[in-house]
UniProtKB/Swiss-Prot annotation:
One of its GO terms (biological process) is toxin catabolic process. It comes from Arabidopsis thaliana (Mouse-ear cress). Residues 88-208 form the GST C-terminal domain. The gene is GSTU22. This is Glutathione S-transferase U22. GO terms for cellular component: cytoplasm; cytosol. Belongs to the GST superfamily. Tau family.
């Protein structure tokens, strides 16, 4: 009997896209269900009663929540193709450390870039660039955070890469002069087939970002 794989998601989400990419890296057939986050479906509330957030992967009726937890689950269940996490325990621990850094240090300033203006937005841009510079140092001269292989940290970052262009246009700043090596890796990731299949057009993301700003009266 074939696995039933359902993904509850929201198209512009930098977190939901991680699950989409991981599934496509593994060649897993799945049913995509778009969620209205202002009117969440009974299935989402049932499958993620604690946080009530996307993405939720439902595998044979069992839910897995939180984006990078979902990615790790996908890697472990469909382990015969394109490993996402390294096999070495130390390298796995390091990958998890940097993913935690990504979501701890990037999310809040990124959110403020989209939702604020003036001095608050300027502070957010500085914090964002500072965190990206630390990530660029960790990346070094490698093509990917996983070395020669697209992996766990790259998937986490691709959610943010997908919003780089919109963030730059919204807040009138440029990431590449500050982080050229990171941007080169970002462009490499964004050209990957699993990523291209999982992302929407940057202009559509920008239009959505302007809607967010209107909601917050910015």
């Amino acid at each position: 009997m074939a696995d039933e794989v359902i993904l509850l998601d929201f198209w512009p989400s930098p977190f939901g896209v991680r699950a989409r990419i991981a599934l496509r890296e593994k060649g897993v057939e799945f049913e995509y269900r778009e969620e209205n986050l202002r009117d969440k479906s009974p299935l989402l509330l049932q499958m993620n009663p604690v946080h009530k957030k996307i993405p939720v992967l439902i595998h044979n009726g069992k839910p897995v929540c939180e984006s990078m937890n979902v990615v790790q689950y996908i890697d472990e269940v469909w382990s015969d193709k394109n490993p996402i996490l390294p096999s070495d325990p130390y390298q796995r621990a390091q990958a998890r450390f940097w993913v935690d850094f990504v979501d701890t240090k990037l999310f809040e300033p990124a959110d403020k870039i989209w939702q604020t203006k003036g001095e608050e937005q300027e502070t957010a841009k500085k914090e964002y660039i500072e965190a990206l510079k630390i990530l660029e140092t960790e990346l070094g001269d490698k093509p990917y955070f996983g070395g020669d292989t697209f992996g766990f940290v790259d998937i986490a970052m691709t959610g943010y890469y997908s919003w780089f262009e919109a963030s730059e246009k919204l807040a009138n700043f440029s990431i590449e002069p500050e982080c050229p090596t990171l941007m080169a890796s970002a462009k490499r990731c964004l050209q990957r087939e699993s990523v291209v299949q999982s992302l929407h057009d940057s202009e559509k993301i920008l239009a959505f970002a302007y809607k967010i700003r209107k909601i917050y009266c910015v």
